[in-house]
Amino acid sequence: MDNGQLAGNYCYKMFESKIQLTGRISGNNIELTELLNGKPNGYFKGKIFTDNADRFEGNWTNSNGKNTYAFKTTLSSACASDSHNKRYELLIGSDDEAEKFMKQVKTSIINGNKEWIANHISYPIKIKLVKGKTATIKNKKQLIENFDQIFHHQYKGLISASCVCNMFNNYQGVMLGHGIIWINNTPESTSSRYGYVITAINN
């Protein structure tokens, strides 16, 4: 926010794509313009409430003013960064790169790409096998051998339903959903040469 001017985005979950927003805030009143391909597509107009839960609610109207819908958003988590241009402030690399990697993680798990996942994990890593038994996977071979137990049907469902846009992040890295997968930079990453790796699997 700069002198009441706002800039940001929100995620269209179905397509895992970001829609850009610009607008202004005055007191508790907010007006936002939704942009698609740089052109106005709709307008949010509402108020911020902090009585029992931090929330923003009001009405969304499309660009021609013919359709209006009520909306309500509630704060679910805070971001470590104060810039919408660099959400994952503690990670080396751009937000797009981090989200692209998480998208590849998600797709590879759902499609059963064992080799790719095995090649992008920080070992050793703790996981749960069938019946809740905890185990430590020490290398790629063990990961591939236990892949179907680790990434079981129910867990894949949670991964499939999780969006890779605007993910929560902190000093531990970036998490998918409610912490079902965590990623971070590879240990040897530098500002000029870096990569990403899975650091936690909470199955």
Task: Label every PLM stretch briefly.
Residues N113-P124:
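Short, well-ordered alpha-helical segments enriched in acidic and aromatic residues
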Residues K133-N146:
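A solvent-exposed, acidic/Ser-Thr-rich amphipathic alpha-helical stretch
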Residues A78-T107:
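Short, low-complexity N-terminal intrinsically disordered segments enriched in polar/charged residues
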Residues I127-K133:
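A short gly/proline-enriched turn/hairpin at secondary-structure junctions
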Residues M1-N52, F56-E57, N67-T74, K86:
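Central antiparallel beta-sheet cores of small beta-barrel/beta-sandwich binding domains
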Residues P124-K126, N203:
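Solvent-exposed loop/turn segments at secondary-structure junctions
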Residues Y43-S63, L143-N203:
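Exposed beta-sheet edge and beta->alpha loop/turn motif
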